[in-house]
Curated annotation (Swiss-Prot):
Keywords from the UniProt entry: Methyltransferase, S-adenosyl-L-methionine, Transferase
Gene Ontology molecular-function annotations: nucleic acid binding; protein-glutamine N-methyltransferase activity
Name of the protein this chain belongs to: Ribosomal protein uL3 glutamine methyltransferase
One GO BP annotation of this record: methylation
Organism: Neisseria meningitidis serogroup A / serotype 4A (strain DSM 15465 / Z2491)
Catalytic activity: L-glutaminyl-[ribosomal protein uL3] + S-adenosyl-L-methionine = N(5)-methyl-L-glutaminyl-[ribosomal protein uL3] + S-adenosyl-L-homocysteine + H(+)
UniProt cross-references to SUPFAM superfamilies, sorted A to Z: S-adenosyl-L-methionine-dependent methyltransferases
GO cellular component, one term: cytosol
HAMAP family: L3_methyltr_PrmB
Keyword S-adenosyl-L-methionine applies: yes
Pfam families: MTS
Function text: Methylates large ribosomal subunit protein uL3 on a specific glutamine residue.
Keyword Methyltransferase: yes
Amino acid sequence: MVHIMFNQAAQELTTIRDVLRFAVSRFNEAGLFFGHGTDNAHDEAAYLILHTLNLPLDMLAPYLDAKLLEAEKEEVLTVIERRAVEHIPAAYLTHQAWQGEFDFYVDERVIIPRSFIYELLGDGLRPWIEYDELVHNALDLCTGSGCLAIQMAHHYPDAQIDAVDVSLDALEVAGINVEDYGLEERIRLIHTDLFEGLEGTYDLIVSNPPYVDAESVELLPEEYLHEPELALGSGADGLDATRQILLNAAKFLNPKGVLLVEIGHNRDVLEAAYPELPFTWLETSGGDGFVFLLTREQLLGEE
């Protein structure tokens, strides 16, 4: 049911400033969760309004007092109401998600890009990968939208990249993004479950696998219910996929190869399960407990 305030707003709101204020109030009233691109009601509302009106996303102030046409107002308020009532993440409403300077097409076939791994590509992996030109073959496990594979292609200009996912739906979305960036000759999309059926070895393997434990899956905010469950949950402790990666990665790494994996809030659980592995935890904007690095030698117990 459309919220009763929608019709009132359509009649009484005039400017972008009016609609922005209304949207912030509406989002706060609805108790929305923010974390798929913005972290507060104001920024979320501003993004949705600017995107819907085809205005620059970084130029809200000059347009605040601009009056809206009736058709524009209806379109913007419809988006605001869908966000408030259905708890659909903004990225699914706009079909656009950002990571750094890169933007990607997304829909409900893939999770919304939010991995910290992209921050580490290039300079963040020194000294393990001393020069970007040393990466000739790379692998992105659980590629989803293809965002990390595309950013690897940017940071490692000489690399050929395999991007793997068990979901054909996800690979269709990844294909859209790979084509948008003109990387069809450098990124190969592969339908398989982690390493199954892969051949060859890689200088760099990255993965943002499912890592939410069973109990936490049940407690996720409503917004997460719009994301594919396959890409979120990973067994009782959240480590099912990570265990398979740790078990098999060494066989697919070159002698100086590096494994980079994001595991959410599972650092303590992982270290307790693998006390013999010398995990290096890399600093990201989220802290130093989300992404670990292991070399091939460390995985084999040779270092």
